Amino acid sequence: MSKRLFGTDGLRGQVNIFPMTAEVALRMGLAAGSYFRNGKQRHKVIIGKDTRLSGYVFESALTSGLCAMGMDVFQVGPMPTPAVSFLTRNMRADLGIVISASHNPFMDNGIKFFDSSGHKLPDAVEDEIADMVLSQDTQWDYPQAEKVGRAYKIEDARGRYIVYLKYSFPQDMTLNGVKLVLDCANGAAYSLGHMFEELGAEVVRIGDKPNGLNINDKCGSLYPDILGQRVVEEHADLGLALDGDADRLIVVDEKGQVLDGDVIMAMCAADLMERGKLNHNMLVATVMSNMALENFMKENGGSLLRTPVGDRYVVEAMRREGAILGGEQSGHLIFKEFSTTGDGLLAALQLLRILCVKNRPLSELSGLLELYPQKLQNVHVKRKRPFEEVPAVQDALKQVEQELAGKGRVLLRYSGTESVARVMVEAEDSSKVELYTSELAGVLEEHLR
């Protein structure tokens, strides 16, 4: 039952269509309050959101449910997802909640949770909360009237987050002489660009005028080519593209070339290994990361540990293995020394530190990783049947794997947040990548639509 609610990154869907309705959000607040309330002390919840118009709806509904269960709610307004994770730890809160659909368009929204340590909730806890939300038999254990919660607005949350971010950058280093273009996707980080200016950089801003409807609209991490054009026009040193909730980063070099999460991870891993600071010489990434990244780590005396897709699974593996660097090709980058989740602005500062230390163009520094040709194609599906239960899909998959003969990879997976099957093919020969991706997508369209 609960799997109808939570995907790989919390609850997500189209606004005013189940499950993204005010009614579900109210019950979500009641359920979360019921689950996390314990003892006689006052309980704190941090709620942040991105810039979607519908954020007001879900912020109010969640707040009502939580306060009804005796939780005090601290609303921080538009705020990056990683900022809510940080503030949950910093303010000693019991729970952090983010209202965002990340890189999705404005008509979607979502809800995700952080525990008191700033980590995303385990699947089992999400499932318990979801079962309370969905069950018609749930009996709410309301507190007495004098013990209901209050709602507060925190005005200095942005300042706290910026101080924390700047702490991750060397105190004796500045960004004097660096010119960058920052694309905030008209999202949660729209007002935070001055942080780079405080460190000395010249900043050209785009995607920093949200109106509630333009989040991720032809801007941000899904449209790096637009950023690349602007970087070249401005003669900037690099471009930084965030998504709607600023938990991911895509970078553009001074020539306008796009660098994805794999390239950024390779640069950061190389820097940490060079300084003897990469624990176990291990990098954690997902099954989507390019084979070239895995080979790069091996060639440099390290290793790559792969996880299922989702930065939460990367973080879980990092905690288990004692790794300090991990991420996703999509731009979620986790620096465990400073953060418990993906943080686009934090990752940007770590990359800028390398750029300043090396004093070389980004296009040269990124040349350490030559990616194998890779293609990802989405196929819309009516329902997510297990691939192993569809003989035609299994036959096509086996045939492609045999033809690649170990010189490439094929990955079929369902999106955790959309009704989409994803086909990923990777090989040394780009023509084979195109051919096999098209063939497999055709089989999925025929048998899963």
Curated annotation (Swiss-Prot):
Activated by phosphorylation. Its EC number is 5.4.2.10. GO terms for cellular component: cytosol. Keywords: Isomerase, Magnesium, Metal-binding, Phosphoprotein. GO terms for molecular function: magnesium ion binding; phosphoglucosamine mutase activity; phosphomannomutase activity. HAMAP family: GlmM_B. This is Phosphoglucosamine mutase. It comes from Maridesulfovibrio salexigens (strain ATCC 14822 / DSM 2638 / NCIMB 8403 / VKM B-1763) (Desulfovibrio salexigens). The lineage of its organism: Bacteria, Pseudomonadati, Thermodesulfobacteriota, Desulfovibrionia, Desulfovibrionales.
